[in-house]
Curated annotation (Swiss-Prot):
Annotated active site: S102
Cofactor binding annotation: Binds 1 Mg(2+) ion per subunit.
PTMs per UniProt: Activated by phosphorylation.
Protein name: Phosphoglucosamine mutase
InterPro entries referenced in this protein's UniProt entry, alphabetically: A-D-PHexomutase_a/b/a-I, A-D-PHexomutase_a/b/a-I/II/III, A-D-PHexomutase_a/b/a-II, A-D-PHexomutase_a/b/a-III, A-D-PHexomutase_C, A-D-PHexomutase_C_sf, Alpha-D-phosphohexomutase_SF, GlmM_bact
General function of this protein: Catalyzes the conversion of glucosamine-6-phosphate to glucosamine-1-phosphate.
Gene field: glmM
Entry's family note: Belongs to the phosphohexose mutase family.
Molecular function, one GO term: magnesium ion binding
Catalytic activity: alpha-D-glucosamine 1-phosphate = D-glucosamine 6-phosphate
Organism: Polaromonas sp. (strain JS666 / ATCC BAA-500)
CDD domains reported for this sequence: GlmM
Phosphoserine PTM sites in chain numbering: S102
Transmembrane spans: none
Obligatory cofactor(s): Mg(2+)
Amino acid sequence: MTRKYFGTDGIRGTVGQPPITPDFVLRLAHAVGRVLRRVESRPTVLIGKDTRISGYMLESALESGFNSAGVDVVLLGPLPTPGVAYLTRAQRASLGVVISASHNAYPDNGIKFFSAQGTKLSDEWELAVEAALEEPPVWVDSATLGKARRLDDAAGRYIEFCKSTFAHDLTLKGLKIVVDGAHGAAYHIAPKVFHELGAEVIAIGCAPDGLNINHEVGATHPEALITAVKANQADYGIALDGDADRLQMVDADGRLFNGDEVLFLMVSERLARGEKVPGTVGTLMTNMAVELALKSRGVEFVRAKVGDRYVLEELEKRGWLLGGEGSGHLLALDKHTTGDGLISALQVLQACVRSGKTIAQLLGDVVLFPQTLVNVRLKPGQDWKASEKLALETKAVEAELGDTGRLLIRASGTEPLLRVMVEARDARQAKACAERVADTVRS
């Protein structure tokens, strides 16, 4: 059954346009409340948000919808998505709700949910909510209405949780770190985490005004971080996105490290400590250099579909702990139930402090392969999968690339585009092969 409202990461859109309107969000919360009350007589839901101006409006709508269904609400205020996941589990709540559109600009917003265990919810649960949305509301009587209260120390509890994932025998003393909070949910949290572990912290992107979230700052705009690291002669730079589940890092030279490289470092740090890492999960877009480097160290590597929920599914299926995406969504399931930019950064810094090496030194000879991505607009009705010419060209390119390169062809989920990605040790070869395949699609 196809979902009508839920996407790969909750419900998202432009504020004021369906479904991100106050009336729909109220009905959504009421429907979720009814689903919760099928298994629990008096559920409690936690609600956190990022710093978008629309968060106030949507928070009020959610609160009203839940209360009208007989569900109690605990308001957390601005808090990173992984912080909501953690507190949902720690507070023994029935459900966690996040109001955020992650790395998008302020006109967008969204609603996503976490289970009582702090994990993403199943497709079946989302379908049950959508079915409840189609039914007329059933308002509870006045004596059964839910109540709302605030958890005043939500940020402090999450800060302590993040710090607890860093080795207790280590500190960040002597390090100067630039922290970019993307004017988002971690603006009042991220600087404190690193400062309380001993670092000298320079904060940028930590002055939200409701409209500037992700604007020319944060993980999707690392130029600001690179400039600040160089200007302040810092040792490291850490950039989060609007809801702080995504990470990009920079070293003292201004070199940017993406999620693929950070994943490799997280695995390597554990191997160096003598831990067993049977395997890790990346995505279809994970750089092949990382795959080869991990395999050379005896670590199995599996690719999931693009999206952190698919990485998580593969990890849980195989009983593994570490996975992630090049975009900076990283999972360490023995540290947290979901991707967490702050905890991922702490794992990298722990590796650097313990070894006395920089990120670049820890990566050693692992150099990402050049990637070429070409977007080809499809003609109306064009069935690229049935093209014999494309099948032959694909086979020829894959033969040319051999074991040190790869070709990935996938359709866009939102536009009539075919994405052709080629990865190879040689940038010119990658570009030439990608153009050959793209030209075949166009012909």
